């Protein structure tokens, strides 16, 4: 089977063509030179968490308990904090070699009667766009996951290659979540989550009553309101009925994420929310698992006639534009195609047409990497009526936290901002420009 001559130019064109077709949007027509640019400093938080902020190890714990904003003490200290926390210290037991402690994120915001428009720019550590993602590797008998983010033990030990997509996230509060305006993302980050202290085993999570009820195998972002104890411990969850009441009251956070591999090639971003877990919105994402649960074989392979090969290799897995995009560079997986040990296929396939419901709200998002800088233009519809969204509306102010995942990393290995206010026709730290 031919696998070694994957043509990167052909692959890139095939992977992004669906997204490029959607870029004749209002966002692409904006004269961004007329919209003010705000520079935010995002910093590496290490293993600082909701619980740590309230512990004796944090000098400002008493102020946190009183509801004081993190920025009250630390505004302007982001770069200093990041430089300290990214190195070996009590909050960083597994420092990442060469990891930067800070990222400058330029933010521009505009809106009209129908949409909010965001433009972001940031420099990356990598010398190429971080749009590669872990794959499935054929070992001669089975297809198994291959590649891990840099914090994963297998990547740290060199047992598997460190590989993961770049990502930009916005977490949005409309004032309904107590404490978010002061603490931002730290309200959602807890002991027990992935790559955090006291991470439980899969079996322990599965045995927990809440996690069994919601059918989750690990601990991810959640809000303190969904726990029963003062420490907001992951294991002390409320009932599903109680959590649904919290959601019905609107006391959740919107979490929307642009992903360099799993959404950008089809011109989209995903849509989710944080409550008892980090959930996706109702409907279907643009990215779907490429593993058939019944046959334990991939669903799609590359169309060799279009991209030059049916699979990736170790030499080509990091090349730009390796996403499987249905209808552009894919054919149905053929188990009899002569697969050899070492052949690689992406873990997800992408389908713009297959995305649906509230999960598909972010339909016009364009990310371009050039000269070491990502530029992402993002359209978010105003006045969304879905029960799992925070609707952006004229006349309102929102508390928003930003995060960038860079350099083959996920989970806590990002750089984050303190919460910033954004107003649409209202006074705020960032006031969106009203378009005529």
Segments predicted by a language model, with ranges:
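Beta-strand-rich interaction surfaces with strong enrichment in secreted/lumenal proteins
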Residues: 105-108, 363-369
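Exposed beta-sheet edge/beta-hairpin loop segments within beta-rich domains
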Residues: 365-372, 389-393
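Sequence context of c-type cytochrome heme-c attachment sites
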Residues: 23-67, 81-108, 130-131
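Bacterial N-terminal signal peptides that target proteins for export
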Residues: 2-11
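Short, well-ordered beta-strand segments enriched in hydrophobic/aromatic residues
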Residues: 115-122, 374-380
């Amino acid at each position: 089977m031919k696998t070694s001559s994957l043509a990167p130019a052909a692959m890139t064109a095939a992977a992004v063509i669906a997204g490029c077709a959607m870029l004749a949007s209002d966002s692409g027509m904006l004269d961004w030179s007329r919209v003010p640019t705000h520079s935010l400093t995002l910093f590496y938080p290490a293993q600082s968490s909701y619980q740590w902020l309230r512990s004796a190890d944090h000098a400002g714990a008493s102020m946190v308990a009183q509801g004081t904003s993190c920025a009250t003490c630390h505004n302007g200290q982001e770069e200093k904090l990041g430089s300290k926390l990214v190195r070996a210290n009590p909050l960083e037991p597994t420092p990442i070699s060469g990891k930067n402690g800070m990222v400058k994120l330029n933010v521009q915001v505009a809106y009209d009667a129908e949409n909010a428009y965001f433009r972001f720019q940031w420099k990356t550590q990598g010398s190429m766009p971080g749009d590669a993602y872990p794959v499935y590797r054929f070992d001669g008998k089975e297809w198994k996951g291959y590649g891990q983010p840099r914090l994963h033990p297998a990547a740290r030990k060199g047992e598997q290659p460190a590989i993961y997509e770049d990502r930009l996230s916005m977490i949005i509060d409309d004032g309904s979540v107590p404490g978010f305006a002061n603490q931002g993302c730290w309200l959602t980050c807890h002991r027990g989550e992935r790559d955090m202290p006291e991470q439980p085993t899969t079996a322990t999570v599965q045995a927990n009553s809440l996690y069994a009820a919601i059918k989750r195998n690990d601990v991810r972002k959640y809000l303190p309101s969904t726990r029963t104890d003062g420490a907001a411990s992951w294991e002390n969850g409320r009932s599903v009925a109680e959590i649904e009441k919290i959601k019905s009251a609107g006391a959740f956070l919107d979490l929307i994420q642009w992903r360099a591999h799993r959404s950008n090639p089809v011109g989209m971003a995903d849509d989710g929310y944080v409550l008892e877990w980090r959930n996706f919105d109702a409907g279907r994402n643009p990215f779907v698992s490429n593993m058939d649960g019944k046959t334990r074989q991939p669903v799609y392979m590359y169309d060799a006639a279009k991209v030059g090969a049916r699979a990736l290799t170790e030499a080509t897995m990091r090349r730009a534009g390796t996403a499987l995009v249905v209808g552009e560079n894919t054919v149905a997986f053929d188990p009899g195609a002569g697969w050899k040990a070492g052949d690689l296929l992406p873990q997800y396939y992408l389908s713009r047409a297959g995305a649906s419901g509230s999960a598909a709200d972010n339909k016009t998002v364009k990310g371009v990497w050039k000269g070491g800088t990502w530029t992402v233009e993002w359209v978010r519809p105003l006045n969304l009526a879905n029960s799992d969204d925070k609707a952006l509306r004229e006349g309102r102010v929102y508390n928003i936290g930003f995060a960038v995942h860079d350099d083959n990393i996920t989970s806590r290995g990002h750089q984050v901002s303190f919460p910033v206010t954004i107003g649409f026709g209202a006074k705020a730290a960032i006031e969106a420009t009203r378009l005529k």
